[in-house]
Design a protein with these regions (language model features):
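Conserved ABC ATPase signature
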Residues: 73-77, 81
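H-loop/switch region of ABC-family ATPase nucleotide-binding domains
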Residues: 133-134
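A short, surface-exposed alpha-helical micro-motif characterized by mixed small hydrophobic
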Residues: 139-141
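Conserved beta-strand-loop-alpha-helix hinge in the C-terminal portion
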Residues: 153-176
């Protein structure tokens, strides 16, 4: 088969210098993205390759909260920090399409929420995002559409509600806990919202 983007096959697309940076890929092992001795040098080299101003580097550093690791070797920082640094490098040229492989691996709950909000902002401005992940909780909260693969075949496809609500095994903890009590709850926020609405109704009565 062929993979096409904007009418061009990927092989043709890669040879088009004007298309450089339009497709971004984050591989499962983010160390593969680094060749320089520090995170700062890596970002600067990438920005130089795309002829980007310093302000763009500073923006992604701020977005991904990398100030504390800029002088560190990529091999010396934590998995979550490395993941954030790799995503920062990916975002520098402002790609139109982003492929992410296990992007939330190593991230704590706080930064997962921050990262999910970032993906929403990117999607809102027209960036297409394809995420491969085993993090069902993250997908349920932040994905617009999901597809579940088993043995190389798509066995379910649709909104997170379509894919996860009726699934007994591949679903979120919130869904398992609230099933039969709270309708259509996939995330902790939805469970909390339902409880708050019940409490308000009780007080009103």
């Amino acid at each position: 088969g062929k993979v096409k983007y904007r009418g061009k096959t990927i092989s043709t697309f890669r040879k088009d210098k004007g298309s450089a940076g339009k497709i971004g890929v984050l591989v499962q092992n983010p160390l593969c993205c680094f060749v320089m001795d520090s995170v700062a040098e890596e970002l600067e080299a990438t920005a130089k390759a795309y002829k980007l101003p310093r302000s763009v580097i500073e923006e992604v550093i701020d977005i991904m909260q990398l100030q504390s690791v800029l002088g560190s070797n990529p091999y010396d920082i934590s998995g979550g920090e490395l993941q954030r640094a790799a995503i920062a490098k990916l975002l520098l040229p402002e790609p139109e399409v982003i492929f992410l492989d296990e992007a939330t691996k190593g991230m704590d709950a706080f930064f997962k929420a921050e990262f999910g909000a970032l993906l929403r902002r990117l999607a809102a401005r027209g960036t297409a995002i394809v995420l491969v992940s085993h993090d069902i909780e993250f997908c349920a909260e932040f994905a617009d559409r999901c597809a579940m693969f088993f043995n190389g075949t798509v066995i379910a496809e649709g909104t997170p509600q379509d894919v996860f609500l009726g699934n007994s095994f591949y679903t979120t903890s919130a869904c398992r806990i609230s099933r039969g009590i709270i309708p259509d709850a996939l995330t902790p926020e939805q469970v909390i919202d339902y409880a708050n609405r019940c409490e308000r109704k009780k007080n009103d009565d």
